[in-house]
C-alpha cells in the first residue's frame, strides 16, 4: 500500500464533472448535517486514470465509497469495509468544494484538514470511540478498547497527540488516547489525496473556522 500522499490535481473539467455527478446522483441519503450520494459509476470513469497511475492498471477494483457533503467534522474511523485485511488497498479522497459562512465567523480554510493517523486496523470498518458510550446507528462497528480489540501501532495508553487536541475539539479527547498523527492534508478542492484503507483518520473541526460545508468523493479500492 502507498503511504499517505497528495496526488496530481484534477483538471477543471474533471472537478466540474464530479460535482455534477453528485448534484445529479440517483442514490441520495440524507442525515442531520450530512448528505451522501452512492452512485459512483460515472465518477469512477472520471478518476480511473488517476487511480491507475497510483496503483497500476488492472490491479484494483472499487470496493465502496461515496460522495459526501457534510456540515460536521467526522469521527475517528477506518475505511476497511468487510473485505478482509488481505484485500484492502487504498482510500482515494477527492475534495470538490467548500462553502464559507458569511457573517461574524472569521474564515480560516487552512483549518479544514484531514488527519491520517499512524495506527492501523485489520477489522471491519469502524469508529474509534474510547472513553464514550455513544452508539452510532451506522454501517461501522464501534471500537472502544483499542489495545484489547487490536488497534495496531498504539502509543502509550495515556498519550494525547497535540495535533488532534488542536484540530479536533469537536470530539471527546478520550477518543484520541494512544493515537498519533502521521500526515495532515489541507482540504483544497481539486487536490486529491490517498492513504491505506486500514489507517485510522479523522477530520478537523472545520465548522468552527468559518466553513459551512465541504463536498468530497471517497473511493475505497481492493486488490483485483
Task: Map each language-model feature to its residues.
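Non-heme Fe(II)/2-oxoglutarate
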Residues: 1-78, 102-110, 130-153
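Catalytic core of non-heme Fe(II) oxygenases with the double-stranded beta-helix
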Residues: 71-199, 204, 208-224
Amino acid at each position: 500500500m502507498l503511504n499517505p500522499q497528495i496526488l496530481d490535481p484534477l483538471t477543471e473539467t474533471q472537478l466540474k464533472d464530479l460535482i455534477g455527478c453528485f448534484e445529479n446522483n440517483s442514490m441520495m441519503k440524507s442525515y442531520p448535517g450530512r448528505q451522501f450520494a452512492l452512485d459512483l459509476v460515472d465518477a469512477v470513469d472520471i478518476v480511473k486514470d488517476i487511480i491507475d497511475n497510483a496503483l497500476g492498471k488492472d490491479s484494483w477494483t472499487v470496493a465502496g465509497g461515496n460522495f459526501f457533503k457534510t456540515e460536521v467534522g467526522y469521527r475517528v474511523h477506518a475505511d476497511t469495509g468487510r473485505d478482509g485485511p488481505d484485500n484492502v488497498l487504498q482510500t482515494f479522497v477527492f475534495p470538490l468544494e467548500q462553502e464559507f459562512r458569511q457573517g461574524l465567523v472569521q474564515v480560516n480554510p487552512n483549518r479544514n484538514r484531514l488527519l491520517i493517523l499512524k495506527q492501523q486496523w485489520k477489522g471491519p470498518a469502524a469508529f474509534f470511540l474510547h472513553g464514550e458510550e455513544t452508539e452510532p446507528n451506522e454501517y461501522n462497528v464501534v471500537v472502544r478498547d483499542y489495545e484489547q480489540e487490536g488497534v495496531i501501532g498504539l502509543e502509550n495508553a495515556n498519550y494525547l497527540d497535540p495535533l488532534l487536541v488542536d484540530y479536533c475539539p469537536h470530539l471527546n479527547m478520550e477518543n484520541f488516547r494512544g493515537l498519533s498523527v502521521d500526515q495532515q492534508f489541507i482540504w483544497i478542492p481539486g487536490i486529491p489525496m490517498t492513504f491505506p484503507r486500514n489507517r485510522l483518520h479523522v477530520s478537523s473541526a472545520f465548522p468552527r473556522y468559518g466553513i459551512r460545508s465541504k463536498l468530497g468523493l471517497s473511493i475505497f479500492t481492493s486488490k483485483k
